[in-house]
């Protein structure tokens, strides 16, 4: 695993003065919505809520993916049920939609893959973003 991360014991130890977001689809709460079920996701959300109170925000993203739509529906329900504020965010890997192909080429160079190789998981596939919606969006486009 190559992305830095911390465990909950460290979060508990250094929780003061932190603001916490539930994260993207790989965050604990959205991931549990998609992979384990709403009950487990809600239990995880309650842990974060008890620890951070008003400093916890439910993060919503819209990159045009079906799994995001499913997670967002449940996250909005949780926000209303538990009175947790919502924050809209967008993962950005490039500044404009026109740069999506250049970013995909960069990923191919990094991984030593050809762009013609299909995006997916496992043998015969390569890493890539699911669509071209990972650009920095203006306020009007974002809303």
Identify what each model region corresponds to.
Residues 1-143:
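Phosphodiester-processing cores and adjacent nucleic acid-binding clamps
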